[in-house]
Amino acid sequence: NQEPIGETVVITEPQELELADYQKLYTKLKAVAGEVNKSLVTVMAASSDTDWFNEIYESRREISGLLVGNNGVELLVLIPYEPVKDASLLQVTFVDGTSLEAVLKNYDRVTDLAIVSVNLAAVDDSTMEAVKIADLGSSKSVKAGDSVIAVGSPAGFAGSLKFGNLVAPGHKTSAIDGEYRLLITDME
C-alpha cells in the first residue's frame, strides 16, 4: 500500500481547472510511473525456423516483463508466455540498459504467464542498485473509478504508458483450473 503523495485537499466550492492543473496532474502521474519503471524489463525472445525455400531465418520479439523476485540465486521476471514459448534465446534488458541472458523457469498456459530468470551472479552492483523488485499489492481494496496506470508496453511497444480508470474491478471469469478476478479498465 502506498501513502498518498502530497497533502489532502478538501474542495467546498466548484473549481475550474486550467491547462496548468492538468499538466501538473499528469506530471505527478508520470512520476509514479517512472518509479515503477525500475521494476520493468524488456525481454527479447529469439527463435529460428525454416521458410518455404528451406532457408533458416531468425525472428525476434520484444515484450515487457516485471521483476517479481530475488531468491538469492536468480532475479525472477514475470512475462506473457505466448511470445517466448518457442524461443531458443531469451535476453533481459534492465532499466539501466544492461542486457543479460535468461532462461524460462516455468509457465502456465491457462493464464499465459511465465517466469524467466537471470543468474544473479551475472548482474553487476550498479544494475542491482538501479532495479527494484515490484511491490505487489492486493486488488481486493480497489473500487470502480480508481485511477490506474498501465506501464510496460500497453500501446504495443516497450516504454509506452497509459492512464485510465477501473470500470469493473470485481469481474470474475472461469478457466480450466479455477476462477479469476479481472480488473477491467477504460483503456483501449
Q: What are these regions, as identified by a protein language model?
A:
Residues 1-7, 148, 165:
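Gram-positive cell-envelope targeting signals
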Residues 2-67, 77, 84, 89, ...:
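N-terminal activation segment of mature serine protease catalytic domains
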Residues 31, 67, 103-105, 123-157:
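Active-site substrate-binding loop(s) of clan PA
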Residues 38-43, 65, 75, 79, ...:
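Terminal peptide-recognition signature
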Residues 43, 88-96, 148-153:
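Short conserved beta-strand and strand-loop elements enriched in small hydrophobics
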Residues 48-49, 60-61, 70-72, 85-86, ...:
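Short, conserved beta-turn/loop elements at beta-strand boundaries and strand-helix junctions
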Residues 70-112, 120-121:
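Catalytic-histidine neighborhood of serine endopeptidases
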Residues 121-134, 162-188:
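Active-site region of chymotrypsin-like
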